[in-house]
């Protein structure tokens, strides 16, 4: 890392700082970290809620998919998906980030509408909701799954 920094130092300043910053950020590796998604998945398993898939090949790339119950779960990061409670636009390059986040929100709506039209129950959680009360989120999802099981069972009769 030090070698990279010295190479980019020109007259006491960094040349091409954004490219260097990007390269340095890619080099950072998390250690002993658990993502919000991993914590939620573990909480589901601990609650006895299994038979879900991650990385399902569905439109919109839901974070968790329950094929039998026709339930898809999106765990939206507050920054990337423009949370109305705690999402924010960075102070630098504001127009880029505002456009980017608005596009993300529009894409989310379009993809979820398609999933809804295909008969999926859509469950959405904001990152801050999971951090504030994970067990509540798990209980709500358990209730939705149970309701869908009853609905599916009534069609089978």
Predicted regions and their residues:
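Nucleic-acid endo/exonuclease domains
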Residues: 1-157
